[in-house]
């Protein structure tokens, strides 16, 4: 099976998701999730950060954790193709891999 790119990269598609997509806010985690159905056969993910999120090492670690948790939970989205954008907006988050994985598992079931 060919490895698919699960990253969302097109600027036009990202703007469309921000405008037309559904929004879920998590005030206790300072996290927002936008999602919208796509016409592809697979789901895609984008993790972005607000301007207040400092430190490239921490940003890249959080991004890697989200992508890995999403990749492992991709089978829950079988038959549904959605584009998901996570906006992380606070620097002092205590995000562990297991917390992110349980968050994504619950969110995927809501989508």
Curated annotation (Swiss-Prot):
The keyword RNA-binding applies. Its EC number is 3.1.26.5. GO terms for molecular function: ribonuclease P activity; tRNA binding. InterPro entries: Ribosomal_Su5_D2-typ_SF (IPR020568), Ribsml_uS5_D2-typ_fold_subgr (IPR014721), RNase_P (IPR000100). The keyword NAD does not apply. It catalyses: Endonucleolytic cleavage of RNA, removing 5'-extranucleotides from tRNA precursor. It holds the Pfam family Ribonuclease_P. Keywords: Endonuclease, Hydrolase, Nuclease, RNA-binding, tRNA processing. It comes from the Bacteria. Consists of a catalytic RNA component (M1 or rnpB) and a protein subunit. Belongs to the RnpA family. RNaseP catalyzes the removal of the 5'-leader sequence from pre-tRNA to produce the mature 5'-terminus. It can also cleave other RNA substrates such as 4.5S RNA. The protein component plays an auxiliary but essential role in vivo by binding to the 5'-leader sequence and broadening the substrate specificity of the ribozyme. This is Ribonuclease P protein component.
């Amino acid at each position: 099976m060919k490895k698919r790119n699960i990253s969302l990269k097109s600027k036009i598609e990202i703007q469309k998701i921000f405008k037309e997509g559904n929004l879920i806010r998590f005030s206790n985690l300072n996290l927002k999730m936008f999602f919208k159905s796509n016409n592809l056969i697979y789901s895609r993910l984008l993790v972005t950060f607000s301007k207040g999120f400092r430190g490239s090492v921490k940003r890249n670690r959080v991004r890697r954790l989200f992508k890995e948790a999403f990749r492992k939970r991709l089978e829950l989205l079988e038959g549904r193709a959605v584009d998901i954008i996570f906006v992380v907006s606070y620097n002092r988050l205590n995000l562990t891999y297991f917390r992110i994985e349980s968050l994504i598992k619950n969110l995927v079931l809501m989508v």
